[in-house]
A protein has these predicted regions:
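Feature of multi-pass inner-membrane transport and sensor proteins
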Residues: 1-24
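Helix-boundary and loop/linker segments of multi-pass membrane transporters
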Residues: 10-15, 27, 112, 130-131
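Alpha-helical transmembrane segments of integral membrane proteins
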Residues: 22-32
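Alpha-helical transmembrane segments
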Residues: 30-57, 69
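Short beta-strand boundary microenvironments
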Residues: 49-50, 73-151, 158-170, 185
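Small-residue transmembrane helix packing/gating motifs
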Residues: 54, 168-192
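A short beta-strand structural signal in non-transmembrane regions
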Residues: 58-65, 143-144, 165-168, 190-192
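Short extracytoplasmic
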Residues: 62-78
Length: 192
């Protein structure tokens, strides 16, 4: 053994507290490294699943409620232009719900369309089964978990009861999807 190896061995056996601190320090650092790499690999797939498989739209254009008919006609012309492959009008509303004891105040986005579904912009699915809006309200899985509701049960939002027809996969945010007919039945009015 060289002199440095002998000194190292002597110090390890002579100062047991330092030895234990070194061992636990190295073990803790390695554990943190593995935890960080594990979290990175778990989260790495979320953006592609959410924004390439589920929400496939490229842009959201909001119409000003106080826009004139001429402004609306101009917007319609732009949307029908050759640069736009497809578009779909939806009504979107942001709601807040407090899940006391679970996750606190959460923001929920309600999306309503006059079509049977939101494809090709949003793909609603549950275990590779495509979902449509013709059966009623579709909510996202995490929202269903927070609210403690399953298919066939009702979710109370803003004093309104929404009967859950389906639960869709989602990785970012909370969403409620419904058709125009469902919206009118629940709220008793057209979406403004």
């Amino acid at each position: 053994l060289s002199f440095t190896h002998k000194v190292t061995a002597r110090n390890i056996f002579r100062y047991k507290q330092r030895m234990l601190m070194t061992i636990f320090g190295v073990a803790g650092s390695v554990a943190l490294l593995f935890a960080g790499l594990g979290i990175q690999s778990s989260v790495a797939g979320v953006p592609s699943k959410q924004f390439q498989q589920i929400q496939q739209y490229q842009m959201i254009v909001s119409e000003n409620p106080s826009a004139t008919n001429q402004d609306k006609a101009e917007l319609e012309e732009v949307l029908k232009g050759k640069d736009i492959q497809a578009y779909q009008k939806i009504y979107s509303k942001t709601l807040d719900k407090d899940f006391k004891g679970k996750a606190g105040l959460q923001t929920i986005t309600l999306m309503m369309t006059d079509k049977e579904d939101l494809t090709p912009f949003i793909h609603l699915q549950h275990h590779q089964q495509e979902l449509t809006l013709k059966d009623g309200v579709v909510i996202t899985a995490k929202l269903a978990q927070l609210a403690g509701v399953k298919v066939g049960q009702t979710l109370e939002i803003e004093g309104k009861e929404l009967k859950v027809a389906s639960i869709a996969e989602n990785y970012v945010g909370h969403f409620i999807y419904m058709s125009q007919a469902s919206y009118e039945q629940i709220y008793g009015q057209l979406a403004q």
